[in-house]
Amino acid sequence: MAVLIEDVFPVGVSIEFLDAVTDEMGVDAELPPGGIVHVHFERDGRAHGVDLWDSVEAYEQFVQSTLMPVMGKVAVARGLDPSKIGEPEVTITEVHRLVR
């Protein structure tokens, strides 16, 4: 079953940082396995990401194998300590109906 993933990143994680992470992963050309759609934006001074995934397992695999390592790499390249970036607030919702 498809899931909607909503990430609200800690203050200090800018939209430009998420752009750099997205660019480094190259997901504009092709989404990772299980990914259906991704958007990120800024609201109320915080970066947000919203994704649609085939499953929670596909999302979790992507986070561990790709997203976290790339976020660390981008943080270091920007002179930041990856351990101090913090974790996003994550909400996972099962999708009742998906129209493509």
What annotation goes with each model-predicted range?
Residues 1-69, 76-100:
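Short S/T/G/P-rich N-terminal loop/turn motif that feeds into the first structured element of a domain
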